[in-house]
Amino acid sequence: MSFSKKYPHLFEPLQVNQMMIPNRIISAPLGSLTDKSVSGIGMIIRGTSGSVPGPRSRMAPGSYCFANMQESQKVREQVVTIQQRGAKAEFELCHVGQYAYVQPGDYAIGPVGFVREDGIEVKAMDENMMNEVADAFAKGAVDAKEYGFDMVMLHFGHGWLPTQFLSPHYNKRTDGYGGCFENRVKIPIQIVER
């Protein structure tokens, strides 16, 4: 049996709101987009760990982020290449929270404060920090639209900052952002609503 007969819907277009994706094959933000864009994939996701603008959002230095304006022309060219070859371009926004790569003397942020094994301080986020992070996600989404991306994905998995708030393992807060699920989900909801 042929692949297309075994999975007939895989190669059908998919309507998402006003956007039509040419098929249901979506590529994660890994590897070379040039190779992917000639392969017939319906949507190619770009982004990296810590793509939300800000000094404490990245997993490693040099992460793919709009905050680095030297990348701007390269990003626009990549989006155009993806779209010219018939695929849709999606940008993945994520913030790594307590796992952030920071400069010596700086700190990471998370639901609770502690010192990591590498000696980096993680500061418990106050409401101002929470608002700054939600604003940074919103700015990243606006930037993605300005760069020509067709869609934005908010990456709340892999233990990144929103998941750190959702998880009772990481979130030991005793205020209105910890404890029951309704409290722990407040920051992810705030990010989505921005």
Q: Residues of each region from the PLM?
A:
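Flavin-dependent oxidoreductase catalytic cores
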Residues: 1-194
